[in-house]
Swiss-Prot record:
Keywords assigned by UniProt, alphabetized: Cytoplasm, Molybdenum cofactor biosynthesis
Coarse class of the protein's main subcellular location: cytoplasm
UniProt-annotated catalytic positions: 121
GO molecular function: sulfur carrier activity; sulfurtransferase activity
Protein name in the entry: Sulfur carrier protein FdhD
Lineage: Bacteria, Pseudomonadati, Pseudomonadota, Gammaproteobacteria, Enterobacterales
HAMAP family linked: FdhD
GO BP terms, alphabetized: Mo-molybdopterin cofactor biosynthetic process
Matching Pfam families: FdhD-NarQ
Coiled coil region boundaries: none
Assigned GO CC terms: cytoplasm
Length: 275
């Protein structure tokens, strides 16, 4: 991918996922100036006519988000189980209508019945601690990554942050190959949404060898989503939580935090990491 610089962006045109507003800057309080802000809108994921969840997201790459979310949440196991995705703006946000296979929709309805009455956060309402861990088969050990290639990948991360370079307001998630080349990526104001978008893109690409690189910290949900989609290595620019490490250990995922030039902290399964 070629390097994108802020100077390469035509600021006279509309940018998907960002818009301009008048603001007042320190030392220039008498003169309003135009500034770019990232968009954050409610996005409803609707499966076979039934609204499943509303997420706050940047309104770009929403088809990839729908596919990646469906995979990382275990609603489907393969892209072919979604027959159609239709993105429709509404007065209050955006609806993403997803047509599921009848088998997967039946499974989703059963899950919704089991979840009835729970609150919105990821862990709240779970009756047993073991319920935090999804029944994901432990990952195989088929991947390796040399940390000498990590700096090259980090230098390319901003390439997928067109909105982020204008606003300073988005997270990035990217797929990097063992040579440290960034093959593709996505951005969003939400780190989980950025990751889901990437996982949706990856599901349609022949990307097998490599790792996930995210610009954020690594929470247990980020680890779980990555493992659910079969990726064996997750690099996070910031730290990992204790639960993220525990989940990564259980699923055989190699988790690396503080992934910065000349630096990396390997938390789990270091046998995949070379130097």
């Amino acid at each position: 991918m070629s390097q994108i610089k802020p100077s390469d962006i035509d600021l006279s045109t509309e940018i998907c996922g960002a818009r301009q507003l008048n603001v007042l800057q320190r030392h220039h309080m008498a003169e309003p100036q135009l500034d770019w802000l990232a968009e954050e809108v409610p996005v409803a994921l609707v499966y076979n006519g039934i609204s499943h969840v509303v997420m706050m997201a940047t309104p770009k790459d929403l088809e990839a988000f729908a596919l990646g979310f469906s995979l990382s949440e275990g609603i489907i196991t393969a892209p072919q189980e979604i027959y159609a995705i239709d993105v429709t703006p509404s007065c209050n946000g955006i609806e993403v209508n997803i047509e599921l296979s009848s088998r997967r929709f039946a499974g989703l309805k059963e899950r919704r019945r089991a979840m009835a009455g729970r609150t919105g956060c990821g862990v709240c309402g779970i009756e047993q601690l073991d319920d935090i861990f999804r029944p994901i088969a432990p990952l195989p050990f088929t991947q390796t990554f040399n940390l000498n290639q990590l700096d090259n990948a980090l230098a390319q991360l901003k390439q997928v942050q067109t909105v982020g370079q204008l606003t300073g307001c988005t997270h990035a998630a990217a797929w990097i190959n063992p040579q440290g080349e960034l093959l593709g990526g996505c951005e969003d104001v939400g780190r989980h949404v950025a990751l889901d978008k990437l996982l949706g893109v990856r599901a349609k690409q022949p990307w097998q060898q490599g790792a996930v690189l995210v610009s954020s910290r690594a929470s247990y949900e980020m680890v779980q989503k990555t493992a659910m989609c079969g990726a064996e290595i997750l690099f996070a620019v910031s730290a990992a939580t204790t639960l993220a490490v525990e989940v990564a250990e259980r699923y055989n995922l190699t988790l690396v935090g503080f992934s910065k030039p000349g630096r990396a902290t390997v938390y789990t399964h270091p046998n995949r990491i070379q130097e």
